[in-house]
């Protein structure tokens, strides 16, 4: 694999907060999947996200998810591999997947709101890219 192919592949498998928000705002079929434990989801998550902890993912727990949507798993951030584990399981189950870069942490750093008992309001968009 060349370096160019590596970066092209990376963009095929990952998505950042700004691109997720733009896709959602455009009405694209994107479903955010919070792969953390239910308690973490209740404390704070991305608006519209579904709670589906990666440890519970199976054909049964994902049966209601649409096959034509892009599923975007996320977890706390770069120190957490829950979204990667979730992406693997979702791919094995036949879904189309892109992992959210930086997870919930980078979502908030980019200025987007969260919901839950520890929700934060949206701020000015911080992403400089």
Predicted regions and their residues:
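Flexible, polar/low-complexity N-terminal or interdomain linker segments that lie immediately upstream
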Residues: 1-32, 37-43, 116-129
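Short phosphate-binding/catalytic loops that engage adenosine nucleotides
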Residues: 28, 94-96, 112
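Conserved beta-strand positions in the Rossmann-like core of class I SAM-dependent methyltransferases
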Residues: 31, 50, 98
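Short loop/helix-cap segments at secondary-structure boundaries that form the rim of catalytic
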Residues: 41-47, 107
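Short, hinge-like loop/turn segments at secondary-structure boundaries
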Residues: 50, 68, 114-118
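Glycine-rich, highly charged phosphate/nucleotide-binding loops
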Residues: 52-60
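Short secondary-structure capping/turn micro-motifs that flank functional sites
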Residues: 57-58, 106-107, 123-124
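Catalytic cysteine-centered active loop of the rhodanese-like fold, especially the PTP/DSP P-loop
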Residues: 62-108
